[in-house]
């Protein structure tokens, strides 16, 4: 049975989608069967793996409101499978309020196909609302990207409070899968200090490999490619492959 991991941080700009996209590609490259569920209305993970949001047969919004099946919605790419999103998903937060088991719509959908994958990543929106609650109820665990910059720990207290609430009331299996340090700048003492502080807060959960600041990571999405393909020898690509190996050891 595959593991379902929600990639979540309510603070924007921390490398959440970049991490979801590139770990999907790196694990696929390593021979794992991976699905990336784009559950963010911005749909950047969808375009980041080369899909045109204008030409989708179905999308995850239609899945959670019951108008399409997961099997008919998944798109297959050379970088991994994608359950794509569009801006339509923004309306789901309202529509889900009127359906049965609103917090479990994504979980019910993913349970039907989880045996087909080694890992299912969910790219969550950068907020703590109904779409994110759906993601946390669907997941076995969470992966938290944390940028190595000032205010890095801002919002993590709220996220951990939400995690405890969801675990207690909605999804008792939910755990922390890992913490990924992103935007690390080895030229500054500050990045090192932030990394040390995060490791102190999450003992045993922070990946040894950190994701550096790297221009190729910023360029790759505009080409619809993961950095592991856009520039496979770049520091960003090497770092995500190394982090993927750490994940493989935990599977």
Label the predicted regions:
Residues 1-251:
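P-loop NTP-binding core
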